[in-house]
Protein backbone atom coordinates (compact mmCIF):
# COMPACT_ATOMS: atom_id res chain seq x y z
CA UNK A 1 0.00 0.00 0.00
CA UNK A 2 1.36 3.41 -0.95
CA UNK A 3 2.42 5.29 2.18
CA UNK A 4 0.09 8.28 1.59
CA UNK A 5 -2.84 6.02 0.72
CA UNK A 6 -2.15 4.08 3.90
CA UNK A 7 -2.04 7.21 6.04
CA UNK A 8 -5.30 8.46 4.55
CA UNK A 9 -7.02 5.12 5.13
CA UNK A 10 -5.80 5.05 8.73
CA UNK A 11 -7.02 8.61 9.33
CA UNK A 12 -10.41 7.76 7.81
CA UNK A 13 -10.77 4.69 10.02
CA UNK A 14 -9.80 6.66 13.15
CA UNK A 15 -12.52 9.17 12.27
CA UNK A 16 -15.10 6.38 11.84
CA UNK A 17 -14.13 4.84 15.18
CA UNK A 18 -14.35 8.19 16.97
CA UNK A 19 -17.78 8.71 15.41
CA UNK A 20 -18.83 5.45 17.08
CA UNK A 21 -17.64 6.66 20.49
CA UNK A 22 -14.21 5.03 20.54
CA UNK A 23 -11.07 6.74 21.75
CA UNK A 24 -8.90 6.00 18.71
CA UNK A 25 -5.41 6.95 17.59
CA UNK A 26 -3.20 6.18 14.65
CA UNK A 27 0.35 4.99 15.39
CA UNK A 28 2.33 6.40 12.45
CA UNK A 29 5.52 4.40 13.08
CA UNK A 30 3.92 1.00 13.60
CA UNK A 31 5.39 -0.70 10.52
CA UNK A 32 8.98 0.38 11.08
CA UNK A 33 8.98 -0.14 14.83
CA UNK A 34 10.50 -3.25 16.42
CA UNK A 35 7.82 -2.90 19.11
CA UNK A 36 4.48 -4.71 18.68
CA UNK A 37 2.47 -1.70 17.56
CA UNK A 38 -0.73 -1.83 15.49
CA UNK A 39 -1.59 0.81 12.87
CA UNK A 40 -4.48 1.97 15.06
CA UNK A 41 -5.64 1.26 18.55
CA UNK A 42 -9.00 2.16 19.97
CA UNK A 43 -10.79 1.76 23.29
CA UNK A 44 -14.40 1.90 24.34
CA UNK A 45 -15.67 0.80 27.74
CA UNK A 46 -13.35 -2.11 28.68
CA UNK A 47 -12.55 -3.17 25.12
CA UNK A 48 -9.28 -2.53 23.33
CA UNK A 49 -9.03 -2.87 19.56
CA UNK A 50 -5.64 -3.50 17.95
CA UNK A 51 -6.04 -2.78 14.23
CA UNK A 52 -3.98 -3.49 11.12
CA UNK A 53 -5.31 -1.18 8.42
CA UNK A 54 -5.26 -1.83 4.67
CA UNK A 55 -6.75 -0.19 1.58
CA UNK A 56 -7.07 -1.78 -1.84
CA UNK A 57 -8.72 -1.59 -5.25
CA UNK A 58 -8.38 -5.38 -5.52
CA UNK A 59 -10.87 -7.91 -4.17
CA UNK A 60 -8.29 -9.30 -1.73
CA UNK A 61 -5.25 -8.24 0.25
CA UNK A 62 -2.56 -10.35 1.93
CA UNK A 63 -1.55 -9.59 5.49
CA UNK A 64 1.75 -11.05 6.59
CA UNK A 65 2.13 -13.18 9.70
CA UNK A 66 4.40 -10.66 11.43
CA UNK A 67 1.76 -7.92 11.03
CA UNK A 68 -0.90 -10.18 12.56
CA UNK A 69 1.47 -11.26 15.35
CA UNK A 70 2.01 -7.61 16.33
CA UNK A 71 -1.74 -7.27 16.94
CA UNK A 72 -1.73 -10.15 19.42
CA UNK A 73 1.51 -9.05 21.09
CA UNK A 74 0.20 -5.50 21.54
CA UNK A 75 -3.00 -6.79 23.16
CA UNK A 76 -1.03 -9.06 25.50
CA UNK A 77 0.48 -5.99 27.19
CA UNK A 78 -2.90 -4.95 28.62
CA UNK A 79 -5.27 -6.48 31.14
CA UNK A 80 -8.45 -5.25 29.46
CA UNK A 81 -10.33 -7.36 26.94
CA UNK A 82 -8.67 -7.04 23.53
CA UNK A 83 -9.67 -7.83 19.96
CA UNK A 84 -7.20 -8.06 17.08
CA UNK A 85 -8.70 -6.69 13.88
CA UNK A 86 -7.65 -6.48 10.27
CA UNK A 87 -9.62 -3.63 8.68
CA UNK A 88 -9.63 -3.27 4.91
CA UNK A 89 -11.15 -0.53 2.82
CA UNK A 90 -12.27 -2.24 -0.37
CA UNK A 91 -12.39 0.78 -2.65
CA UNK A 92 -14.27 -0.87 -5.49
CA UNK A 93 -17.30 -1.32 -3.19
CA UNK A 94 -16.59 1.82 -1.08
CA UNK A 95 -16.78 -0.19 2.11
CA UNK A 96 -14.72 -0.97 5.20
CA UNK A 97 -14.65 -4.69 6.02
CA UNK A 98 -13.08 -6.38 9.05
CA UNK A 99 -11.67 -9.76 9.93
CA UNK A 100 -10.83 -10.96 13.42
CA UNK A 101 -7.83 -13.29 13.11
CA UNK A 102 -7.71 -16.35 15.36
CA UNK A 103 -3.91 -16.73 15.30
CA UNK A 104 -0.77 -15.15 13.89
CA UNK A 105 -0.42 -16.43 10.33
CA UNK A 106 -0.39 -15.11 6.77
CA UNK A 107 -3.99 -14.18 5.95
CA UNK A 108 -5.66 -13.35 2.66
CA UNK A 109 -8.49 -10.95 3.44
CA UNK A 110 -11.37 -10.90 0.96
CA UNK A 111 -14.80 -9.34 0.83
CA UNK A 112 -16.27 -12.80 1.42
CA UNK A 113 -14.30 -13.73 4.57
CA UNK A 114 -14.99 -10.43 6.35
CA UNK A 115 -17.90 -8.59 7.95
CA UNK A 116 -18.84 -4.96 7.51
CA UNK A 117 -17.49 -2.51 10.04
CA UNK A 118 -21.10 -1.68 10.95
CA UNK A 119 -21.67 -5.34 11.86
CA UNK A 120 -18.54 -5.25 14.03
CA UNK A 121 -19.92 -2.23 15.90
CA UNK A 122 -23.23 -4.08 16.48
CA UNK A 123 -21.39 -7.15 17.81
CA UNK A 124 -19.27 -5.02 20.15
CA UNK A 125 -22.31 -3.08 21.39
CA UNK A 126 -24.18 -6.32 22.08
CA UNK A 127 -21.17 -7.69 23.94
CA UNK A 128 -20.99 -4.58 26.14
CA UNK A 129 -24.74 -4.76 26.86
CA UNK A 130 -24.44 -8.43 27.84
CA UNK A 131 -21.59 -7.62 30.25
CA UNK A 132 -23.66 -4.85 31.84
CA UNK A 133 -26.80 -7.00 32.19
CA UNK A 134 -25.05 -10.15 33.42
CA UNK A 135 -24.75 -10.19 37.22
Swiss-Prot record:
<keyword id="KW-0227">DNA damage</keyword>
<protein>
    <recommendedName>
        <fullName>Crossover junction endodeoxyribonuclease Hje</fullName>
        <ecNumber>3.1.21.10</ecNumber>
    </recommendedName>
</protein>
<dbReference type="InterPro" id="IPR014428">
    <property type="entry name" value="Hjc_arc"/>
</dbReference>
<dbReference type="InterPro" id="IPR011335">
    <property type="entry name" value="Restrct_endonuc-II-like"/>
</dbReference>
<keyword id="KW-0460">Magnesium</keyword>
<dbReference type="GO" id="GO:0003677">
    <property type="term" value="F:DNA binding"/>
</dbReference>
<keyword id="KW-0238">DNA-binding</keyword>
<dbReference type="Pfam" id="PF01870">
    <property type="entry name" value="Hjc"/>
</dbReference>
<comment type="subunit">
    <text>Homodimer.</text>
</comment>
<feature type="binding site">
    <location>
        <position position="39"/>
    </location>
    <ligand>
        <name>Mg(2+)</name>
    </ligand>
</feature>
<dbReference type="GO" id="GO:0004519">
    <property type="term" value="F:endonuclease activity"/>
</dbReference>
<comment type="similarity">
    <text>Belongs to the Holliday junction resolvase Hjc family. Hje subfamily.</text>
</comment>
<comment type="function">
    <text>A structure-specific endonuclease that resolves Holliday junction (HJ) intermediates during genetic recombination. Acts only on 4-way DNA junctions in a sequence non-specific manner; introduces paired nicks in opposing strands 2 bases 3' of the point of strand exchange only on continuous strands of 4-way junction DNA. Cleaves both mobile and immobile junctions. Plays a more direct role in DNA repair than Hjc. Overexpression of this protein decreases the growth rate, and leads to genomic instability, and global transcriptomic changes.</text>
</comment>
<feature type="binding site">
    <location>
        <position position="52"/>
    </location>
    <ligand>
        <name>Mg(2+)</name>
    </ligand>
</feature>
<keyword id="KW-0540">Nuclease</keyword>
<dbReference type="InterPro" id="IPR002732">
    <property type="entry name" value="Hjc"/>
</dbReference>
<dbReference type="GO" id="GO:0006310">
    <property type="term" value="P:DNA recombination"/>
</dbReference>
<keyword id="KW-0479">Metal-binding</keyword>
<keyword id="KW-0378">Hydrolase</keyword>
<keyword id="KW-0233">DNA recombination</keyword>
<feature type="site" description="Transition state stabilizer">
    <location>
        <position position="54"/>
    </location>
</feature>
<feature type="binding site">
    <location>
        <position position="10"/>
    </location>
    <ligand>
        <name>Mg(2+)</name>
    </ligand>
</feature>
<dbReference type="GO" id="GO:0046872">
    <property type="term" value="F:metal ion binding"/>
</dbReference>
<dbReference type="GO" id="GO:0006281">
    <property type="term" value="P:DNA repair"/>
</dbReference>
<dbReference type="InterPro" id="IPR011856">
    <property type="entry name" value="tRNA_endonuc-like_dom_sf"/>
</dbReference>
<keyword id="KW-0255">Endonuclease</keyword>
<keyword id="KW-0234">DNA repair</keyword>
